[in-house]
Swiss-Prot record:
Name under which the protein is recorded: Putative uncharacterized protein DDB_G0277255
Stretches with biased composition (Gly residues): 166-185, 211-223
UniProt biased composition (Basic and acidic residues): 632-646
Residue ranges, compositional bias (Acidic residues): 190-199
Transmembrane annotation, as ranges: none
Residue ranges, compositional bias (Low complexity): 262-322, 344-387, 397-464, 489-499, 527-548, 563-585, 647-707, 727-769, 835-984, 1070-1098
Domain of life: Eukaryota
Lineage of the organism: Eukaryota, Amoebozoa, Evosea, Eumycetozoa, Dictyostelia
PANTHER family, alphabetized: AAC-RICH MRNA CLONE AAC4 PROTEIN-RELATED, RAB-GAP/TBC-RELATED
Region described as Disordered: 136-229, 262-471, 483-514, 527-609, 629-769, 782-812, 835-1005, 1070-1099
Length: 1123
C-alpha cells in the first residue's frame, strides 16, 4: 500500500507502445510509477466513503469490484496484483474502471489513473517510460501519449508535435464510429485469439478498436496539423493587426447577427442526429434542459452506461465519437486508446470505449483541444472567438450543480461539433460553422445547470471553456511569445481558473482543500524538524508554515487562507504534533509508519538548509527519483548513533570502526588489508571474526582479529558475542597487550569518529594521527628481551640498536610468536592489538591482522575453526602447543612437523621460509592448519579447493587489499616456492616478482624504518630438523624496492589483473614480499592450491609490515618524520 503526497498525482507516459515478444507484437502493459511507487499502485483522493474498481484482462476476463476504505489522510489506496496464468504470459492490457459507491461523482479526484501494469516477460527499455509528479489543477508539461489502437497507427504516430495529426485515416466517417465493431462476450479463449488493437470493456468483453469496419482507429481523416498551423499563423497576424476593442466588437457582431450561421449549424446537427439518432437540438441551446447522450458510441454499442445526476447526464465522449463528422476529434488523432474512457487531457488517461466514467479530474475538464481548433479554424472568426474566450474567462461561473458532468458534456459536444465543422463539405460553410459550434458547445455546458436562454449563450458560454493559455502546450513555441503578449484579464492562473469556479461546490467545498493538505503536510514536516532541533517555539512553526500566497504552485483561487484559518490550522497542527512526536509520525502521507519515518536523530543537522518551497518544488519536479529519497534522507545515515553495536548490520554505515568499512562492499577499507574479508571476501579477517564461518581463510581467526581493530567497541559490539562453543570472551578480546603499545591507543567514541569520517579523506582509519602515535610508541616501546624459544634469541647488530624485538613470553597475552618481531612496525588497532602478529602463528602468513587475536596463535584459530578460541590456547601453550590445540599440527607446534620452532614455521611461511615444507613434509604447517580447518574452505593446502578459498580474499573483487592473491593466485610469488625453495630471498626470480607488486607506503620514511629494523634483526631460529632452519632474511634490496607509489597507482598481480580500490587507493600490499612466498610454500606442499596465500587467507598474509603500513597510505609527512 503506497500513496503519494496529497495534492499531486502521478502522470505516467509510455513512449514506446509496442514491443516484439517471441516474434509477435505485444502491447505494453507495464507502467512504472516513479518516486518509489510500486508498479501496481493506484491512488485516489476522495471524500467518499468507499470506491470500487473493476479491472479486466484482455486475455482472460477477470473482472471484479472491490470496495476501498479511505485512510486517515483521506486517500484511497490499494495494491492491485493480477496474476496472469495459463498461456497469457504476454503483457495483457486491462483497463481500469472506477465508480464511487455513492453517487457523489463530483467529490472524487483521480490522482493517478492509467493502465494498471502487470509484470510481463517483455522487457521495456528504460527510455520508454517517463513519470512526473504534477500538482492537481496544473496542466502537465507534455500532451498525453496515447496508446495507438492498431499497429498501423504506430506508423503515423510521431513526435508529440505530430501527435494530433489526423493520420492517414479513411474518408470522412466511412469507417464508422470507434466502437461500432461491438464487444464479444466472454473474452478471448486462447492467446492465439489475441489481436493488436483490442480493447476490453468493463464487463470483460473484447472490443475491436482497430481500423476498418466497426473499428475505432481508422475513422480519422486527413492532416489537421497543416490547417492548425495556418490557422495559428492567421491568428497571429490578426492579433497583431486588431485591437482588443475591435475584437470585442467583431465578437458581438458574430454572436448577435449571424442567424444564417446558426441555421447552418442546426442543419448540421440534424444530419448528425440522423446518424446517431440521439441528439436533439431546440433553438440556439443545445441539450436545453434535457438529458441527452452526447457520445455517439454509446448509442451504437448499448454497452456504455451513462449516469445521470440530479439535473444533467455526465457523459464521456469517447475518442471515437465522431458524431457523424468526417474527421476524428483533434485531440484524438492517431490514438484509439485502450482505456475505456477518453484520454482527454494529459493529466489522466480516461478509459475510451463504451463505458462512462463520470469522474473527470479538474484538469481534465479544463482542457479541450478541439475548442482551440474551433477557435482558430477559420480566418474570419478567429479573432471573435478569441475575444469570446477572453470575456468568458473573466466572468464568474453560473453553474450550480454537477460541474464535472457539465464540463464533460461540454467537452464532448465541442469535440463532436469541431469534428463536424471541420468536415463540412464546403470551405465557406466551415468557417461560419466553427464559430457557431464553439458558442453552442459552450452553451451546452451551462444549459443543464442554469437553463440559460438562447441569447445568453455568450455570457454562460464557457464556464468550462479552457483559456488560451491552457492550450499553449498545443501551440508551437514560436507563437508563445505573441500569444502571451495579449493582455487577457484573467483572475489568478489561467490554467486553473475556468473550471475551478465550476468546482466550487464539489471538490473545493465538499472535500478537504488540497492546498490545505499540503500546508498541513509541510507544517508537520517543518515542525518535526524543529522539534528535533529542540525548537518547539510557535514562532518557528509559524515561520515554517507556508501560506498559499507564498506557494506559486498552489496559487489558485481556492487556496487562499484567511489569517484566522491559518491560526486554527497551526493550533490543530500543534496538537497533532504533541500526539505524534514519535519517529513514526506520518508526514501527511498514508504510508505505514514502519516504512516511512520522519527524519530524526542526526537529520536535524540539515534542517537549516531545508526550504519548504524547495521541498515542495522538488517533489513536483522529482521525475523518477523516489519520494523516500527526499523525505527520508537515507535512513542509514540517520541511524549512525543507533546501531553502535551493530556495525556490521548496516552496509551503508561507516560505523566507528574501519571494520564496517571493510564490510562495506566498497572496500573502503584499504587499511585493513586484513579486512579484505569484507563481507564478501570471506577474507579471513572479518569473516572469521564475525562469523568464523567464512573461514575460507584458514587463518580466518587470525584475520578476524584484524578486523577487530576496525570494530567500534569489541566489548559492546557483536564482535564480542561469540557462540557458546567459543572460549574467547569479550574481556579477553579487550585485554590490552602487556606492551605499552596498547596504552598509546585509546578508543574513540563512535560519534566523534563518525564526525572524523565525514571530514577525513581516508576511507580507512578514522584518525591517522592516533595511528602514527601508536606506531611511534610501538617502535619506541620495544626493548631487547630474550626470546623464550628453543631457538637462540634474535641477535642484534649493536647493543644500542634502537629497535629490538619484544620478548616472547608464553604466559603473557602478547603474541608469543615471532610475529612480535614485527609488532614494532605494525600499526595498532583500536583494541590495541598488533595487526599482524598472530598471522605468523597461522602459518598462513596471516600476519595480517590476526593481531586482534594476538593471544591466539592465528594458526590455532584457523585450525580451531573460525573460533578464535584457539588463539588463547596457543598463547598459554607457548605457541608450540597451541598448534597442538589445533590438532592439525598447528604450524607453530611443528608437532606434526616435528619442527620445534612453531614460530619459525610460521615465520618462514610468512616471510620467506619455505620451512613449512619441512615441518609437514608435504603439508606445510599451513597445510596442517588447513587440515585443521576443514571448515575453512580455505584450507587450500590440504584441500585443493583451497584455491577457491583463497579466492575468497579475491572475492572481495580485489577491492580488499588482500585481493592480490585472488583466485588466480594472483600474486603467487609462490610459483617459485612451489619447488619448496627454502629461502625466498635467495631466489632472484622471486625478487623480480615481488617488485612487480610493490606495496604502497604513505611515506618513504616508513620504508627506511622497516629496512633498519630488518637490517638489525635477522632471525635465525634453529629447528630440531637441521635440514630446514627457518631463516628470516629480508633482502634489503627487496624492501628498498618497495618505493612509495602515487595514491591512484595500480598494481598488477601475476594474472595481469590490476588491483585498485574503488576509492582509488591502491590497497594492495600483501604479496609484495617474500611472505607470499612462504604462503607459496604451503602451496608447494599442495601445489594444487596455488592459493598458497589462500590458507593464509589473508592475502595480506604478506608481510605484516606491509599490511600494517597499508593503512598509512595517506599520512602527513610531519607525523612520519617524528617516527
Amino acid at each position: 500500500m503506497t500513496t503519494i503526497l496529497k495534492g499531486y498525482y502521478l502522470k505516467v507516459t509510455l513512449e514506446n507502445r509496442i514491443v516484439k515478444h517471441n516474434g509477435r507484437k505485444v502491447y505494453l502493459s507495464i507502467v512504472e510509477h516513479g518516486n518509489g511507487i510500486p508498479d501496481h499502485a493506484l491512488i485516489l483522493k476522495t471524500t467518499a466513503k468507499c470506491v470500487k474498481f473493476s479491472v479486466c484482462l484482455s486475455i482472460r476476463s477477470q473482472c471484479g469490484w472491490k470496495e476501498l476504505d479511505q485512510n486517515d489522510s483521506g486517500e484511497l489506496t490499494f495494491d492491485l496484483k493480477v496474476e496472469v496464468t495459463g498461456k497469457s504470459q504476454r503483457a495483457p492490457l486491462f483497463p481500469l474502471i472506477f465508480q464511487l459507491c455513492e453517487k457523489n461523482y463530483d467529490q472524487v479526484t483521480l490522482i493517478s489513473k492509467s493502465v494498471i501494469p502487470v509484470k510481463a516477460i517483455t522487457k521495456i527499455p528504460k527510455k520508454s517510460l517517463r513519470a512526473e509528479l504534477v500538482p492537481l489543477g496544473e496542466s502537465p508539461t507534455k500532451p498525453p501519449q496515447a496508446f495507438p489502437a492498431s499497429p498501423s497507427d504506430l506508423i503515423s504516430s510521431k513526435e508529440y508535435d505530430d501527435e494530433f495529426d489526423g493520420g492517414n485515416g479513411g474518408n470522412s466517417g466511412t469507417n464508422g464510429d470507434g466502437d461500432d465493431g461491438g464487444c464479444s462476450l466472454g473474452g478471448l479463449a486462447d492467446e492465439n485469439d489475441y489481436e493488436d488493437g483490442m480493447v476490453i470493456d468493463e464487463n470483460g468483453n473484447v472490443c475491436s478498436s482497430g481500423s476498418g469496419d466497426g473499428g475505432g482507429g481508422g475513422g480519422g481523416g486527413g492532416d489537421i496539423s497543416p490547417k492548425l498551423t495556418s490557422s495559428l499563423n492567421n491568428l497571429k497576424s490578426s492579433i497583431s493587426n486588431t485591437s482588443l476593442s475591435s475584437l470585442g466588437n467583431s465578437l458581438n457582431n458574430s454572436l448577435n447577427g449571424t442567424n444564417s450561421q446558426m441555421l447552418q449549424y442546426q442543419q448540421q446537427q440534424q444530419q448528425q442526429q440522423q446518424q446517431h439518432g440521439n441528439l436533439n437540438v431546440s433553438g440556439n441551446n443545445i441539450n436545453n434542459n434535457r438529458d441527452t447522450n452526447v457520445s455517439g458510441n454509446n448509442n451504437n454499442n448499448n454497452n456504455s452506461t451513462t449516469t445521470t445526476t440530479t439535473t444533467t447526464t455526465t457523459t464521456t465522449h469517447s475518442n471515437n465519437s465522431n458524431m457523424g463528422g468526417s474527421k476524428k476529434p483533434l485531440n484524438n488523432s492517431n490514438s484509439n486508446i485502450h482505456f475505456l474512457t477518453n484520454q482527454q487531457n494529459s493529466d489522466t488517461p480516461l478509459s475510451n470505449s463504451s463505458s462512462s466514467t463520470p469522474t473527470l479530474s479538474p484538469a481534465q475538464s479544463a482542457i479541450s483541444s478541439p475548442t482551440l481548433s474551433n477557435i482558430i479554424n477559420s480566418n474570419s472568426n478567429s479573432t471573435s472567438n478569441l475575444n469570446d474566450l477572453i470575456k468568458d474567462s473573466s466572468q464568474p461561473s453560473t453553474s450550480t450543480s454537477t460541474s464535472t458532468s457539465s464540463s464533460s458534456s461540454s467537452s464532448s459536444s465541442s469535440s463532436s461539433s469541431s469534428s463536424s465543422s471541420s468536415s463540412s463539405s464546403s470551405s465557406s460553410s466551415s468557417s461560419s460553422s466553427s464559430s457557431s459550434s464553439s458558442s453552442s458547445s459552450s452553451s451546452s455546458s451551462s444549459s443543464s445547470s442554469s437553463s440559460s436562454s438562447s441569447s445568453s449563450s455568450s455570457s454562460s458560454s464557457s464556464s468550462s471553456q479552457p483559456t488560451l493559455n491552457q492550450h499553449s502546450k498545443y501551440i508551437p513555441k514560436s507563437l508563445h511569445s505573441s500569444l502571451s503578449s495579449i493582455p487577457i484579464n484573467n483572475k489568478e492562473n489561467n490554467n486553473n481558473n475556468n473550471n475551478r469556479d465550476n468546482r466550487d461546490k464539489d471538490i473545493c467545498t465538499t472535500s478537504p482543500n488540497l492546498n490545505d493538505s499540503i500546508n498541513n503536510t509541510l507544517d508537520l514536516f517543518n515542525k518535526k524538524i524543529n522539534s528535533n532541533n529542540n525548537n518547539n517555539n510557535n514562532n518557528s512553526n509559524n515561520n515554517n508554515n507556508i501560506s498559499s500566497q507564498e506557494r506559486p504552485l498552489l496559487n489558485s483561487p481556492h487556496v487562499q487562507l484567511t489569517h484566522q484559518q491559518q491560526q486554527q490550522q497551526q493550533q490543530q497542527q500543534q496538537q497533532q504534533q504533541q500526539q505524534h512526536q514519535q519517529q513514526h509520525q506520518k508526514i501527511g502521507m498514508s504510508k505505514s509508519s514502519s516504512e516511512l519515518q520522519v527524519p530524526s536523530s542526526n537529520y536535524h543537522k540539515q534542517s537549516d538548509d531545508l526550504n519548504p518551497l524547495d521541498f515542495l518544488s522538488a517533489i513536483a519536479t522529482m521525475g523518477s527519483n523516489s519520494l523516500s529519497s527526499i523525505l527520508c534522507k537515507d535512513d542509514s545515515k540517520t541511524n549512525t548513533n543507533k546501531d553502535k553495536d551493530n556495525n556490521n548490520s548496516n552496509s551503508n554505515k561507516d560505523s566507528s570502526n574501519n571494520n564496517n568499512n571493510n564490510n562495506n562492499n566498497n572496500n573502503n577499507n584499504n587499511n585493513n588489508n586484513n579486512n579484505n574479508n569484507n563481507n564478501n571476501n570471506n577474507n579471513n579477517n572479518n569473516n572469521n571474526n564475525n562469523n568464523n564461518n567464512n573461514n575460507n581463510n584458514n587463518n580466518n581467526n587470525n584475520n578476524i582479529n584484524n578486523n577487530e581493530d576496525l570494530l567500534p567497541n569489541p566489548g559492546s559490539s557483536k564482535f564480542a558475542k561469540y557462540s557458546a562453543d567459543q572460549s574467547v570472551s569479550s574481556s579477553s578480546l579487550n585485554t590490552p597487550l602487556s606492551s605499552p603499545i596498547v596504552k598509546s591507543q585509546s578508543y574513540q567514541q563512535p560519534q566523534s569518529q563518525s564526525q572524523q569520517r565525514s571530514q577525513s579523506p581516508l576511507p580507512l582509519h578514522n584518525n591517522i594521527s592516533s595511528i602514527n602515535t601508536s606506531i611511534h610508541n610501538a617502535i619506541n616501546s620495544l626493548k631487547p628481551k630474550p626470546l623464550h624459544l628453543s631457538s637462540p634469541s634474535i641477535p642484534t647488530t649493536s647493543p644500542d640498536a634502537p629497535y629490538r624485538l619484544p620478548s616472547l613470553n608464553s604466559s603473557s597475552n602478547n603474541i608469543n610468536n615471532q610475529s612480535d618481531y614485527w609488532s614494532a612496525i605494525n600499526p595498532i588497532n583500536s583494541s590495541g592489538t598488533n595487526i599482524t602478529n598472530n598471522n605468523y602463528n597461522n602459518n598462513n602468513n596471516n600476519y595480517n591482522n590476526n593481531n586482534n587475536n594476538n593471544n591466539n596463535n592465528n594458526n590455532n584459530n584457523n585450525n580451531n575453526n573460525n573460533n578464535n578460541n584457539n588463539n588463547n590456547n596457543n598463547n598459554s601453550n607457548s605457541n608450540n602447543n597451541n598448534n597442538n590445540n589445533n590438532n592439525n599440527n598447528n604450524i607453530n607446534n611443528n608437532n606434526s612437523n616435528s619442527n620445534n620452532n612453531m614460530n619459525s614455521n610460521n615465520n618462514n611461511n610468512n616471510i620467506n621460509n619455505i620451512n613449512n615444507n619441512n615441518n609437514n613434509n608435504n603439508n606445510n604447517n599451513n597445510n596442517n592448519n588447513n587440515n585443521n580447518n576443514n571448515n575453512n574452505n580455505n584450507n587450500n593446502n590440504n584441500n585443493s579447493n583451497s584455491n577457491n578459498n583463497n579466492c575468497n580474499n579475491n572475492n572481495n573483487g580485489g577491492s580488499n587489499i588482500h585481493s592480490l592473491n585472488n583466485s588466480s593466485n594472483s600474486v603467487n610469488y609462490n610459483n617459485n616456492n612451489n619447488n619448496n625453495n627454502n629461502n625466498i630471498n635467495k631466489d632472484k626470480k622471486n625478487k623480480k616478482k615481488l617488485s612487480a607488486s610493490t606495496p604502497i607506503f604513505g611515506e618513504s620514511n616508513l620504508g627506511d624504518i622497516i629496512n633498519n629494523v630488518i637490517d638489525e634483526h635477522q632471525l635465525n631460529s634453529n629447528n630440531n630438523n637441521n635440514n630446514n632452519t627457518p631463516h628470516f632474511s629480508f633482502n634489503n634490496n627487496s624492501l628498498k624496492e618497495l618505493k612509495p607509489l602515487k595514491r591512484k597507482a595500480s598494481i598488477r598481480n601475476s594474472s595481469g589483473g590490476v588491483i585498485t580500490n574503488e576509492n582509488g587507493w591502491t590497497t594492495i600490499v600483501n604479496n609484495n614480499n617474500n611472505n607470499n612466498n612462504n604462503n607459496n610454500n604451503n602451496n608447494n606442499n599442495n601445489n594444487n592450491n596455488n592459493n598458497n596465500n589462500n590458507n593464509n587467507n589473508n592475502i595480506s598474509s604478506n608481510l605484516p609490515i606491509i599490511s600494517g603500513l597499508l593503512s598509512l597510505s595517506k599520512v602527513d609527512s610531519t607525523s612520519v618524520d617524528k617516527l
